[in-house]
Structures are given as C-alpha cells and as structure tokens.
Amino acid sequence: MDKIKRIEEMEKIMDKSADIFSELNAVLDKLYENLPDYRKLDQYYSSQDWFSDAEDSNNNLLPEDLKCGVLSEDGAYNLFGENHELAIRMVEIAAKMLRRE
C-alpha cells in the first residue's frame, strides 16, 4: 500500500471512530440520566404496588385503554435481562478498549 492510500485509510478510520465515540458518549449520557428511573422501575416490579396493580389488571379493574405492559412479567423480565446482558457487554468492550485489543 502506498503512503497516500495508507494515510487516506487511516484518516477515514480516525473520522469514523471519532463519530462513533461521539454517538456513544451521547447514548451513555442518556443511559446514565435514566438510571434513577430504571431503579424506580426495578423497585416497583418487586413491590406490593406492582402485585396490587397486576391483580387489578387481571380483574379488569383498570381502564381498557390504559397501557399496562409494565404489568407483564415477561416484559419486565426481558428488560431486566437485557440490562444485565448490556452491562456485561459494556464491561467486555471497555476491557478490550483498555487493553487495546
């Protein structure tokens, strides 16, 4: 590979990486800002309020047009599982970045 092509290739990689890092920083900011709300959801899911709300939903005591996905055990379970897997993935990627792999 000649010098010009190599420099052009490295320039493209640098620009692409800078864009990705910028996008990731913005998403990480949103994730961090959402943590208190996510913790609130996690606490709700294991609270007596959730069980009471789910029972009311099962007994058709809530408005029919009320969005109640949060009362689905599968929905919350899937979200909590995704959170766990995402956290592991972030740690694994961070380790690779720090080791420069």
Whereabouts are the PLM-identified features?
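Long, low-complexity or tandemly repetitive, helically biased scaffold regions used
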Residues: 3-101
